[in-house]
Amino acid sequence: TGRSTLQGPDSNNLKWSFHTENIVDSSAVLDHDGTIYIGSQDKRLYAIKPDGTLKWSYDIGSKIFSTPAISKNVIYVCAWNGRIFALDLDGKLKWKIQIKGRISSSPVISANGNLFLGSDNYYLYKISPAGKILWAFATRKYVDSSPAIDNEGTVYFGSNDSRIYALNPDGKLKWHSKTKGQITSSPAIGPDGTIYQGSNDGRLYALNPDGKQKWYFQTKKWIDSSPAVSKEGNVYVGSNDGSLYALNPDGILKWTFKTNGVITSSPAIDSDGNIYFGSWDKKLYALSPDGTFLWSFTTGGVIRSSPTIGPDRTIYFGSSDGNVYAIGEK
């Protein structure tokens, strides 16, 4: 949902930056002790201590576009070349498997520990915690979208075949809904079970859990950013037209905030309702719930990475300048 129970920083103070050797499009995930895990196009997964020093790195032999996932002290990371790795918290390999097709979709872990992820070979996969492929569901085009899973275990995701899919936990199709453009953005599920999905037709779609369309909202360009939903049910989404849109649960526009670049970074909402997101104008933005500008932080490159809110009012994100940034209180 992009919603956090933690507070974000109230200023743009740089705590530290950590340099990798290539673009960082991946977003950060944190474990219980605050270690930050993030991938880089330099082919390494990095484990960074909360003070910004390296804990370890692991060479996975191919660029990392997707965001890692953590469950039960295991880190799962997907490589562009179709390899999936499971590492322990010390960076030791537990297993790796190869699927056909490149992976830019980020793995999502269900309540019982199974992994769900898409591939450029048109499939969405369900993989056990031991690395066994349990099933693969065929779409008609690339699956770059990362799935979302509801409380019943239904799996929602989009495909470049312009469809939003809902699957049962056993991989059987519940329904699909057609959009007017390819889908690379990932869905979000609202507090009432509504599924929100952006598409390259420039629309944000709101669907009921049975697949019926509730409404859509039209932006001026395609949507690669995934929506975030506040606890009140307000929806925030970025568009390639450079604006962040805030909509109420009925799809009525509350406000827009214009940046000077494409927005593919997905917003993060903190416990106060403040919204954080990156733009191709090289800035990370912080806005209040009513769309008021709070602060921005400028990096040396386009920001496609989505911000992650950690403890101690710190935000972590990557930039195409090759750095991972920690913004927070001194």
Task: Identify the residue ranges that each predicted region occupies.
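Extracytoplasmic/lumenal domain signature
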Residues: 1-330
